A protein has these predicted regions:
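Surface-exposed beta-strand edges and their flanking turn/coil or helix-capping segments
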Residues: 17-20, 58-63, 89-97
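C-terminal terminal-subdomain/extension
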Residues: 66-158
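A broad, low-specificity signal marking well-ordered, structured residues that form hydrophobic/aromatic
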Residues: 2-5, 45, 75-81
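Compact nucleic-acid interaction/catalytic patches
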Residues: 26-28, 38-73
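GIY-YIG nuclease catalytic motif and its immediate N-terminal context
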Residues: 1-27
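Residues that form or immediately flank small-molecule/cofactor binding pockets and catalytic motifs
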Residues: 9-10, 52, 85
């Protein structure tokens, strides 16, 4: 199951832009996100933001909405956040109706690709699966996943 929400002001206070530069911020307002639950991330939500312009393929690009005809709109996996506190979840949000309908139809596909995006990162960083350096950079160089190693169960050996 999923919900469409905004992230709360408390989230942005606890994850300030100067320390978490890859997390999306919009002056004075929050991003709309889809809350996904993923089996191996118990007690957490994976919040994937809707973007008007997504110039890469690390996510799901809408194909059938009016907005997607003018923009590269999509759900951006590279800017996801993982939250374990309910206080980080803000109010419900409404999104473009065409994108909502397309999301509903594609939800299983999006969910599977999101799980793979996270899984491949964790496996690479933990040393269980090695992605080519160029492939890793293309997928994860600007990713927010580096901020959520604790939630992902990643222990970086020093």
């Amino acid at each position: 199951d999923y919900e469409i929400k905004k992230l709360s002001e408390q989230f942005y206070k606890d994850y300030p832009h100067d320390q978490y530069q890859e997390i999306l911020t919009k002056e004075g307002r929050s991003y709309d996100v889809v809350l996904f639950e993923i089996d191996y991330l118990a007690d957490c939500y994976v919040c994937v933001p809707f973007r008007t312009e997504m110039k890469h393929n690390n996510g799901y690009k809408f194909k059938f909405s009016g907005r997607s005809k003018k923009h590269q709109s999509g759900l951006d996996f590279s800017k996801l956040v993982i939250v374990s506190k309910n206080e980080y979840i803000g109010e419900s949000s409404t999104i473009d109706i065409d994108e909502y309908k397309e999301f509903e139809k594609q939800e299983d596909h999006i969910h599977k690709n999101l799980e793979k995006y996270i899984h491949d990162y964790v496996e690479h960083v933990n040393g269980h699966m090695s992605l080519h350096i160029k492939q890793f950079e293309r997928k994860y160089k600007y990713s927010t996943l580096k901020y959520f190693h604790k939630e992902l169960g990643i222990v970086v050996k020093r």
